Amino acid sequence: MRASPTPWLSRAEPYCQRESPMNLLTTTPAGDRYVTFNGIDFEGNMARVLAHLRRYIDDPRTGNAFWDRFKARLAAAESGGNAFQDKLLLLHSHVYYMGDLFEDQEDEAALADLRKLEEECF
C-alpha cells in the first residue's frame, strides 16, 4: 500500500494544532499585548498618528494623489460599522508609507508616535 502524499490530511487534529515549536512554548512573551491587549490605548495611538499625518496629507505642498486616495479610504473606514477595526487595518497597511512621509519631513515626534502605534497595536 502506498503512503498518502498528504499525510496531514488523514490526521484527526488540525494541522495548526499539531506539535510544533510554537505549541511547545511554556513562557509568556513580555508585554501584555500578546496576551490580552489590556491597557493599550488603541484609539489614542491612532488619533496621534492621524493628527501628524493629516498635517502633511491635507497640505497641498506635501499631499498627492496617493494620500488623496488614503483620505477617501479613511473616510469610508470611519463611517462603516467596524470603524475601529477598519481604521486600524488601514493604518497598518500604510505604515511604511507613513514612515517615509514622516522621515522626509524630519518629524521625529510623528515617527515616535508611529513606532508606538506599530509596537503596541499591530
Curated annotation (Swiss-Prot):
InterPro entries: CowN. The keyword Phosphoprotein does not apply. Pfam families: CowN. Transmembrane segments: none annotated. The keyword S-adenosyl-L-methionine does not apply. Keywords: Nitrogen fixation. One of its GO terms (biological process) is nitrogen fixation. Is required to sustain N(2)-dependent growth in the presence of low levels of carbon monoxide (CO). Probably acts by protecting the N(2) fixation ability of the nitrogenase complex, which is inactivated in the presence of CO. Belongs to the CowN family. This is N(2)-fixation sustaining protein CowN. It comes from Azorhizobium caulinodans (strain ATCC 43989 / DSM 5975 / JCM 20966 / LMG 6465 / NBRC 14845 / NCIMB 13405 / ORS 571). The lineage of its organism: Bacteria, Pseudomonadati, Pseudomonadota, Alphaproteobacteria, Hyphomicrobiales.
